[in-house]
Amino acid sequence: MSSIRNLSFLLLSLLVIACGSNPQPEQAAGPDSLLIKAQELARRFIITDGHVDLPYMLQEKKVTISEATRDTLLSTSMGEFDHARAVKGGLDAPFMSIYIPVKDQAAPGYGMALADSLINQVEAIVRVLPEKFALAGTPDDIRRNTTEGKISLPMGMENGAPVGKDIARLQYLFDRGIRYITLTHNKDNQICDASNDTTHTWKGLSPFGRKVVAEMNRLGIMVDISHVDDSTFYQVMRLSKAPAIASHSSGRHFA
């Protein structure tokens, strides 16, 4: 009890000192100085973006990466990413999103054919522009690529549906470069329940989904809890042996 009183007295003393010091307010920084500071930080540190929808956008626009279409990746008004804007903004390692829509998760193969196609697109970017882009599967890859002046293209898969009902597919996806998996998208799948679906099929993770999380931990694939419902989130937090990520969401909203 005495230790609690001592701690309370210490906190109260600090509060009184803080209130009585009456420091002069700092001059608010102007927009120009803030921009300069931001640019300085962007040069000093490696910056990543957890979710860039370039591969699926190319698929939707029916753009096949080749020598004839390479300029689309250098500078374009189509989409939200190109080399010029990445360099200007100091973006070093944008995660290419291998996005599997809900319609594909219910199809034969659970969307694996689309996943392969989108991964092929990312690999084609590196083949066509090897002086600008490089694949990355580890932090060391990203550091090396950054030192060489290249933008790293790590990959994450949005929607775990392509895992199907075969846990071995996780090894295949890892070997193809996938380093995080968003467990589901806008509808419940075979792994877990989604935040936008009121069905609550599994009341969180399915029995298979629990095995998926454990195998992702073993392989080194990050568990992404964007799009999952509350029950799934809490179950992942209890089950996962590694920190989970929210690749493109805050507590309640998507970025």
Label each PLM-derived region with a short phrase.
Residues 53-55, 229, 250:
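Catalytic metal-binding/acid-base residues of hydrolase active sites
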Residues 167-175, 197-245:
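Histidine/acidic residue-rich metal-binding segments in metalloenzymes
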Residues 1-8:
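Bacterial N-terminal signal peptides that target proteins for export
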Residues 184, 226, 247-249:
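Generic beta-strand/beta-sheet core signal
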Residues 90, 178-180, 239-245, 250:
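Glycine-enriched alpha-helix->loop->beta-strand junction motifs that scaffold or abut catalytic
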Residues 160-164, 221-228, 252-255:
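Active-site glycine- and acidic-residue-rich loops that bind
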Residues 8-17:
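Bacterial N-terminal signal peptides
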Residues 20-200, 254:
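N-terminal hydrophobic targeting/anchoring segments and the immediately downstream early-domain regions
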